[in-house]
């Protein structure tokens, strides 16, 4: 059925609503003769009158009532189809703006973006890698659509979409003395050089809270706001470093070891947006993808 034909069907619907060909023509911004002609053409095509013509207007016949019900169903289907087409147009183009913790920047987020762009190659991404405080600030300022951060600070109008409990893990060279163990205690790391994330980062803050309640003292040889630098220190200077498990990627030279839950409690990695905000279609769809992946990672 052509869109032009659907427009002519709307003439019948409008006449039925108005109860008058003249009033319907005024609503449609066409002449009464044009409306009457289209109605008569349809009646001839159907082989039955749609309206009873009366002195003070028109009234639907039984056939007309059936036909108008069909028209309205068709009109609803067309509107849904047009809405879906607009969604697809938005889905296939646009920009997803997201702020994330550093732990997500090396492997997890690039992998998920690549998977999304394999389906929608015209969608672009604007990724901000920040500590959790700054990430939430950019969300509050409408500079990004989504955040994916570890231990997000309180924001009154923040709407979590998905959260995943994360443990802190230790990164070390494959030939480190502790690498032979499947799980370590923080006390095992005492006496070995360590490189830590700076104090603005969520993982470091969690570790600092634990150390403040203990008598453990680490030999801290380097601190940085760059996880890439810390990873380089692990490989080049044989130190131990710490981060959340989702961002800890092993290699032939670098291994990841769990830290006993008795030492460091798990905390939440949270995907979220501003409450009540209608996201651009690409951002909403990407959020759905991330939520599915995070859900699948639950133990």
Regions found by a protein language model. Give the residues of each.
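Short beta-strand-centered segments that line the small-molecule binding cleft or hinge
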Residues: 3, 70, 76, 88, ...
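Short helix-boundary/capping micro-motifs
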Residues: 13-31
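A short LG(V/I)-centered, amphipathic sequence patch enriched
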Residues: 43-60
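Central regulatory/effector-binding core of bacterial HTH transcription factors
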Residues: 93-155, 223-226
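A late-sequence structural motif
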Residues: 108, 257-299
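Hydrophobic hinge/microswitch elements
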Residues: 131-136, 140-144, 149-150, 200-257
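Beta-alpha-beta core module
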Residues: 156-162, 166, 181, 228-276
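Secondary-structure junction motif
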Residues: 193-214, 279-288, 294-298
